[in-house]
Amino acid sequence: MPPLCILAVVKRRAALIVVGILSVGCKTDAQIIPKSQVASVGQNVGPAHIEIIYHRPVARGRDLFGALVPYDRVWSPSADTAAIFSTTRPLDIEKSQLPAGKYSVWAIPGKDTWTLIFSSAVPVFHLRYRDASDVLRVKITPQSGDHMETLGFYFPMVDADSAVLALHWGKTVVPLKIRAR
C-alpha cells in the first residue's frame, strides 16, 4: 500500500475513534420527557409548613369527571405516583384533625360531593389505593371555575392561621379548608 493510502486509513480510523469517545459521554436529545410533569406547591399556614408534590395530568380535550374519571370511584389526583401532602404541624382539614406527617392524597369524585382521602401509604403508585391506610376522609362540595388544562393544586386564600388549598382540573375546583393547630 502506498504511504499516502496508509496515512488516509490511519486518519480515518483516528477520526472514528475520537467521534466514538466523544459520543459516549454525550447526552441524547431523544430522552423521554413525561407528559405529566412533576409540580409542587408549598405554603406556610401559621406555624405549619404545607407542601404537596404531584404529577400534572393534562385534559387534552377529554371529558374529565364522570367520563375519564368515573364518579364514585377512588381516583388519584396525580399521574404516575400518588400526590404527596406533607405538613410539619397538625392541621384541621374541613374541621377534622390531621396529624403532622406525610400522606398520599386520593379522591372520590361525585357529581355533588367529593371525598378527599389522606392515606399513610407513602410513596405509592397512583393506582394502588388501600383503604386500610386511610388517616382522614373529608367531604367537600366542588365548585365550577375557569377551564384549567393541566391539573393543579394551589392556595387561592391564605390568612394568618388558615388557608384554602384548591384542586383544579378542567372546570372543577375542589376547595379544601385548612386551619393550623
Tell me the role of every PLM-derived stretch:
Residues 28-73, 123-181:
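Primarily secretory-pathway and cell-envelope proteins
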